A protein has these predicted regions:
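A hydrophobic, multi-pass inner-membrane permease signature
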Residues: 1-286
């Protein structure tokens, strides 16, 4: 294999450094602005690259029992409960559709794929949620999107890749479908489950559209509150007292951005080893 030329390596390094700066500098500006004083941000034209006197005042203001604290709890609860329920439903349905000879398996698969190709519109979805009595309830953020077809197809394909000999050996030992799923399929699918679980968690955490449709403002999750702070900052309820309206300073807006971004970023390091294992498993053939 020919060794890359120094010029080529230098070009790749410069391009990679440019991409890193393009990604990291905006986030650094957001964090720095959230830690700066209001006067320093105003003097800097609305943003600060590095605060001279860092302060946590913006974080104290929005986390002192106000709407952001409540919204953070809502988002965390919806993300945890929604991810667990979605994984449970997706795993069971994917396992059933991955096994040959399941009664009605192909029609169900075609029906699921049909919903992927032709998703329901906003008005039919709203009317369905209304008829089910789910308006202004947290269930409206989970039940309408409980199973994602893409994640279902990913898990189904992974389950189909498990050698049939393992299924046959379990059957000979007298294991039923649930025992096979719990004792054989799930332990072998940790990498796929981690990826799909992360997809679900990110989707639930970042969801704001359904909240704007189905929930009143006192039940909003964090992303909807974030949108209100950043896009319509002049019409906010006071984050500390819960009364009146204020114009959110730039420091408060950036602090809300950090609070909305950091929790989901912290999940990646814990799942990194499963991603690596999944890549190696797909690259090595027995």
């Amino acid at each position: 294999m020919e060794k890359p030329k120094p010029v080529t390596q230098a070009g790749k390094a410069i391009a990679l450094a440019a991409v890193v700066l393009l990604v990291c500098v905006p986030f650094l500006v957001i964090v720095s602005t959230s830690l700066a004083s209001t006067d320093e941000v105003v003097a800097g034209g609305g943003w600060v690259l590095w605060p001279t006197e860092p302060t946590l005042k913006a974080y104290r203001d929005i986390l002192d029992g106000g709407i952001v604290t409540h919204a953070l709890g809502v988002s965390a609860g919806v993300t945890v409960v929604g991810t667990l329920l979605s994984l449970a439903c997706t795993v069971t349905l994917a396992y059933a559709l991955s096994r040959p000879g399941v009664l009605g398996g192909r029609p169900v698969l075609l029906l699921v794929l049909f919903t992927f190709l032709f998703p329901p519109g906003m008005i039919p979805s709203f009317l369905l949620v209304k008829e089910l009595g789910l308006l202004d309830s947290y269930a409206s953020l989970v039940l309408p999107v409980l199973v994602n077809v893409f994640n279902l197809v990913v898990l189904r394909g992974f389950f189909q890749g498990i050698p049939d000999e393992l299924y046959e050996a379990a059957r000979l030992d007298g294991a039923g479908d649930w025992r096979v799923l719990v004792s054989i399929v799930l332990p072998l699918s940790k990498a796929a489950l981690a990826v799909v679980g992360l997809f679900y968690a990110v989707a639930y955490w970042n969801s704001w559209f359904y909240a704007s449709l189905y929930l009143e403002s006192d039940h909003w999750p964090l992303q909807q509150v974030l949108r209100t702070y950043v896009v319509a900052g002049s019409g906010l309820t006071d984050a500390t007292t819960g009364e009146g309206t204020i114009t959110a300073p730039q420091t408060v807006q950036m602090a809300v951005l950090v609070i909305a971004t950091v929790p989901i970023l912290l999940v990646y390091p814990f799942l990194q080893r499963y991603f690596t294992k999944g890549v190696l498993t797909g690259a090595v053939k027995s």
